[in-house]
Amino acid sequence: MNFTNAKSLLSVTAIDCWGFFAPFVANIMCCPQLEATVTVLIGQSSKHTNALALNGTVAKHCLSDVEQILMGQGASGDLRQICSISSSNLTEASCPVKHVNDFKDMVDTSKLLLACADIDPVKECCYQVCHNAILEAATAIASKGSHVLDVDASHDLPEHSIRVNDCRNIVLRWIASKLDPSHGKKVLRGLSNCNMNKGLFE
């Protein structure tokens, strides 16, 4: 994994997850920033690997390297616990699609990029244009290999919801691969802020 292009992201993440303060700003700053940084790293690496997920071994090494870099810049040493992140979060998990070519075959990538390449945080939280495009793409790739049950029935299954959520991570990584690292992080943070605000008012 090449961390050079994400050097500034890692620096910002280290500040947002600074030592003693990390647990107190976990949901507001630290964890969304950490998740965005990891998503951007995997998305950018897919340009060379054609994979939007890491295998188990590489995922362990990658997360460990990220931790070491962040700790070296003053971040908390307990980020895995604080943010409930593990190496499995860097894999495809239950999503049946992880290769870029397969992704492009199943998703209207032009529509997805148009909706998510540049979002206005306020408008996105109100109208959820990018969010809906991501959900549509995630649902599409989650359906790969599902022939036994019809789509409407499968939506009621807990396993289907988990799969769609795992595929959502794949979609976010693809989006990150199409944007420069700093702008990709901005888009991802905008989306996570909307999700957090939605949770507060539900």
List where the protein language model places each region.
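Extracellular/luminal segments of secreted precursors and ectodomains of membrane proteins
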Residues: M1-E202
